C-alpha cells in the first residue's frame, strides 16, 4: 500500500491486483501486485517500470537487522535494498521528477511492484502478463531496474523452464540403514546426472533472440531446494 498511496498522491491511477489462484496465494497471505499509471498527452507510447517487491530469505552473517533498513554512512542496509527496492525507488523518483518539472510528454508512465519474482513469478509478472498488462497497445516498453550496474544493461530474456523433482525412498532405523532406501542418495545421483550429462549440453545451446549481453543468451542450470528457487544456498541443515 505504501507504493500505491504515494503514487496516487502524484496523480497516478493505482490498481491492486490479487493473483487469485496463483501458487502461494491464500487469504492469510494474499499475493497482491500494484500497478500505477499516469496518462500524458494522447498519441504516444507507454513506458513501464517493473520492480519486484519480494526478497529471498535473510540468511546468516548479518551485523544489522536484515529488515531494519538501517542507514549508515549514506547507505541503506537491509535485505532487498539492492534487489530490488533500490530500483523501485529510483523508478518512482525519476517519474516524480518528470511530473514535478512539468515536462510535457505524449503517452503514459507506468510503475508496477510485483510479487513472487524470487520464487517463479507465477503470481507476479507471469500473472499480469497472462492478463495483457504488458502487451501493446497498453504497454510499449518495459524497463526492469535490476541492480546489475551500468556496464551490464541487458536487453531481452532468454526464457526459463521450471521443473520440480521428488525422490522417494524407504524408511529404516539409523542402526540398520541397509534395510532402507535413501531418498537423499537418489536425489544426489540425479543431480550428478544433471551436472555431468545435461549441463554440458545446455551450455552449447543459445537463444536465437537478440538478447544482450551475449553471455545472457547461454542456457544455464540452477538446482535448488524448496522453498527457495532463485538463490544459491550457503547452507542447508
Put a short name on every predicted segment.
Residues 84-162, 213:
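Acidic/histidine-rich catalytic neighborhood of metal-dependent amide-processing enzymes
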